[in-house]
């Protein structure tokens, strides 16, 4: 079913569409750097991926604290880190699929089947992280993933 808020190209196999404001928020993060993270959720009607929260914190721990312990979310974080070779700081956009073990099975299923439509719509993501518990999205784990080959960029 076509929804006037969303473009057909951002419809997932599950029938969940990416709301245009979700894409606009990402483009503002990517281009304007006004926010450092966006947390997305599937709305209660299970028809759209929408922005749940945007933040400007410099603290990765604050961002992690926004992820619910018992439900799924998508997120984008502007991950800034130091290059170990002394070349200074780098920043990479990281896409998170947060699907904790304690989330309801139905929620996990709809988030899994809707992820690709959002992920394809967000151009400029350098790293993708799947998290089922907080250890998988810990700063050190993400740093290891984003810094692979950082000296060659």
From Swiss-Prot:
Keywords attached to this entry: Actin-binding, Cell cycle, Cell division, Cytoplasm, Cytoskeleton, Nucleus
Subcellular location: Cytoplasm; Cytoplasm, Cytoskeleton; Nucleus matrix
Domain of life: Eukaryota
Entry GO MF terms: actin filament binding
Gene Ontology biological process terms from the UniProt entry: actin filament depolymerization; actin filament severing; cell division; endocytosis; Golgi to plasma membrane protein transport
SMART domains per UniProt: ADF (SM00102)
Keyword Cell division carried by entry: yes
GO cellular component: actin cortical patch; actin cytoskeleton; cytoplasm; nuclear matrix
Primary subcellular site in the record, as a coarse category: cytoplasm
CDD domains recorded: ADF_cofilin_like (cd11286)
Domain ADF-H as annotated: residue spans: 15-147
PANTHER family registered for this protein in UniProt: COFILIN-RELATED
Family statement drawn from the similarity comment of this UniProt entry: Belongs to the actin-binding proteins ADF family.
Biological role: Controls reversibly actin polymerization and depolymerization in a pH-sensitive manner. It has the ability to bind G- and F-actin in a 1:1 ratio of cofilin to actin. Binding to F-actin is regulated by tropomyosin. It is the major component of intranuclear and cytoplasmic actin rods. Required for accumulation of actin at the cell division site via depolymerizing actin at the cell ends. In association with myosin II has a role in the assembly of the contractile ring via severing actin filaments. Involved in the maintenance of the contractile ring once formed.
Name this protein carries in UniProt: Cofilin
Source species taxonomy: Eukaryota, Fungi, Dikarya, Ascomycota, Saccharomycotina
Gene name tied to this protein: COF1
């Amino acid at each position: 079913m076509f929804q006037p808020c969303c473009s057909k190209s951002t419809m997932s196999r599950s029938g969940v569409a990416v709301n245009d404001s979700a894409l606009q928020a990402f483009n503002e993060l990517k281009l304007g750097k006004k926010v450092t993270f966006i947390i997305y959720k599937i709305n209660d009607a299970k028809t759209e991926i929408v922005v749940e929260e945007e933040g400007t914190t410099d603290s990765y721990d604050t961002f992690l604290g926004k992820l619910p312990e018992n439900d799924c979310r998508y997120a984008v974080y502007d991950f800034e880190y130091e290059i170990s070779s002394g070349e200074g700081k780098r920043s990479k956009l990281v896409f998170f699929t947060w699907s904790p073990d304690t989330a309801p099975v139905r929620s996990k299923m709809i988030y899994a089947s809707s992820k690709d439509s959002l992920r394809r719509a967000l151009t400029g993501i350098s790293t993708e992280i799947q998290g089922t518990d907080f250890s998988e999205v810990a700063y050190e784990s993400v740093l290891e993933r984003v810094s692979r080959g950082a000296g060659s960029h």
